[in-house]
Amino acid sequence: CDYAEGEKIAVNLEERRERDVFFLEDSEELEIRNVTVRRGGGMGIVAQMCRNITVDGFHAEPNDGEPVSLTADVFHFIQCDGSLTIENSTLCSSLDDACNIHGNYMIAERADGREAAARYGHKDHDHAFYCRPGDVLDFIDPDTLAIVGHATLSDISFTDHEALHLRLSFKEKPNFPIRQGMLIENPKRMPEVTIRNNHWYNFPHVRLSGAGKTLVEKNNFHDCGCAVMAFDLAGYWLESGRMSELCIRENRFGPCRAACIIAGVSG
């Protein structure tokens, strides 16, 4: 990119994005209220495998004259369930998405009887389990994204030191062939989402996915890439969660570089 002489630019030296303001895991009944973040070298809130989350009055705004608040996503929720409410919050000038809600796909490698070997598709998914015994997993054709079958998980473990490869055990032998490359999704462990009465601007996107009901209402979005992107990312980040019910109402959309709303099956 070309920059004009005297133009202020931001240089991000925290590519690993490991300095999050809040990191939440395997927790329930969480409330984060009345927080202001002026500068952070990572994400604002990361929550994975959590249940029933309320974020009320979270403000990520840089000090006057500063170009950046957070160097990554402000909100990032992975395979959470129950309810997720984000309201009365002001977000601006983040270097990545204002909000990203998704699950994680695993990729099938092989299967034998009641067991299957799988791996995570991205190194940043390591050292975490995104399903629990008793969860019903969907197996998805990677070419058509059609659901091929289901299996109930009975056990899960890592098989390597990098914690990227997994052994999955099922309650019963799947009644369909598990092919190498199939995507494995945990669709039920996703939240019902409410994003209400927020002011978000100068950010790339809001990314929403998941089978739970999602309501986006009475927000002000402007000066962004795309205000609402509603689809999973099966082809790149391996982020799962095809939308089932999305309601967008009574919002104000200002200038968006791509579009105000983009919805689809997968991106």
Task: Please name every model-derived segment.
Residues S27-E31, M49-T54, C80-T85, P191-T194, ...:
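Short "repeat-start/strand-capping" segments in structured domains, especially the N-termini
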Residues R19-D20, G41-V46, N63-D73, L95-I101, ...:
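Short glycine/acidic-rich loop motifs that flank beta-strands on beta-rich extracellular proteins
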Residues E15-E28, G42-C50, V74-C80, N186-R189, ...:
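Extracellular beta-strand-rich solenoid/capping regions of secreted or surface-exposed proteins
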Residues C50-L84, A111-D126, N220-C256:
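Long amphipathic alpha-helical scaffold regions
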Residues D126-H161:
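Ser/Thr/Gly-rich low-complexity blocks that favor extended beta-strand/coil architectures
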Residues C1-E18, G149-H150, I156-V193, N197, ...:
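Small/polar beta-strand repeat architecture
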Residues G82, T90, S94-M106:
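Catalytic cores of secreted or luminal carbohydrate-active enzymes
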